[in-house]
């Protein structure tokens, strides 16, 4: 069985070792044939906390890692120049 892969944008990096990735799926409406965009948000495992808000990433399907996490970051395609703030 082949593992599923998706390409999306990181929309949240507030959790430890987890990011939320928004994937936009475009498809024609079955009746009206208009191109419809649907956004799906996946929680993905980021073990080194390397992803920041706005990064374009590739995620792959994996075993369940928690109650909601079934995807893992495979690679960062486009890195944003946004630096993380250090909390004191």
Curated annotation (Swiss-Prot):
GO terms for molecular function: rRNA binding; structural constituent of ribosome. One of its GO terms (biological process) is translation. The keyword Ribosomal protein applies. InterPro entries: NA-bd_OB-fold, Ribosomal_uS17, Ribosomal_uS17_bact/chlr, Ribosomal_uS17_CS. PROSITE patterns: RIBOSOMAL_S17. SUPFAM superfamilies: Nucleic acid-binding proteins (SSF50249). Keywords: Ribonucleoprotein, Ribosomal protein, RNA-binding, rRNA-binding. One of the primary rRNA binding proteins, it binds specifically to the 5'-end of 16S ribosomal RNA. Belongs to the universal ribosomal protein uS17 family. PANTHER family: 40S RIBOSOMAL PROTEIN S11 FAMILY MEMBER (PTHR10744), SMALL RIBOSOMAL SUBUNIT PROTEIN US17M (PTHR10744:SF1). This is Small ribosomal subunit protein uS17. It comes from Prochlorococcus marinus (strain MIT 9301).
């Amino acid at each position: 069985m082949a593992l599923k892969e998706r390409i999306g944008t990181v929309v949240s990096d507030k959790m430890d070792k987890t990011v939320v990735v928004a994937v936009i799926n475009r498809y024609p409406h079955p009746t009206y044939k208009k191109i419809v965009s649907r956004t799906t948000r996946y929680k993905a495992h980021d073990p080194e906390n390397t992803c920041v808000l706005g990064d374009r990433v590739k995620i792959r399907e994996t075993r369940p890692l928690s109650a909601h996490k079934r995807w893992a970051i495979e690679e960062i395609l486009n890195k944003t120049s946004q630096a993380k703030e250090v909390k004191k």
